[in-house]
């Protein structure tokens, strides 16, 4: 039951973060230890992170590795605790292309259909985009 409370708080953070066009993400604390990054380079996805006593949970890893690194930097400005989980809400690139930056994360969590999509035709298209990242 306690876990559901945190899921609700994370979803609230996602609600308050929007899709926007800007240069640098802005970190906003929307609740105690719950942060959202608004704005970013190019098409921006919602990115939220929660700092618990054990570590950090990140929701959606951004549209590029460069943007994902900005998320990591924002986390490190708040805490040095380990990043335990990265959650992908769905398979679109603006929510998953930053996964590679979080490869040292304990676990990347997503619905099984996200994995199926990334392993199927959508994943082949994603792989071509991944190859273009430096």
Task: Explain the meaning of each model-derived region.
Residues 1-6:
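Positively charged n-region of N-terminal signal peptides that target proteins for export
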Residues 7, 32, 97:
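Short glycine-rich loop/turn motifs that provide flexible caps or phosphate-binding loops at active sites
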Residues 7-17:
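Bacterial N-terminal signal peptides
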Residues 9-11, 34, 88:
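Extended hydrophobic/Leu-rich segments
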Residues 20-22:
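Boundary at the C-terminal end of the N-terminal hydrophobic targeting segment
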Residues 26-74:
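Conserved beta-strand hairpin/beta-sheet module of binuclear metal-dependent hydrolase folds
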Residues 73-134:
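Active-site HxH/HxHxD metal-binding segment of metal-dependent hydrolases
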């Amino acid at each position: 039951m306690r876990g559901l409370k945190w899921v609700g708080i994370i979803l609230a953070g996602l609600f308050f973060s929007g899709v926007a066009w800007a240069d640098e993400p802005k970190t906003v604390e929307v609740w105690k230890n719950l942060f959202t990054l608004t704005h970013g380079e190019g098409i921006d996805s919602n990115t939220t992170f929660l700092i618990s006593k054990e570590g950090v949970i990140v929701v959606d890893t951004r549209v590029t590795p460069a943007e994902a690194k900005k998320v990591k930097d924002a986390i490190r400005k708040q805490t040095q605790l380990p990043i335990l989980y990265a959650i992908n809400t769905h398979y679109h690139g603006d929510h998953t292309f930053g996964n590679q930056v979080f490869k040292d994360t304990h676990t990347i969590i997503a619905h099984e259909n996200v994995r199926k999509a990334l392993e199927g035709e959508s994943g082949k298209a994603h792989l071509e985009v991944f190859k273009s990242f430096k």
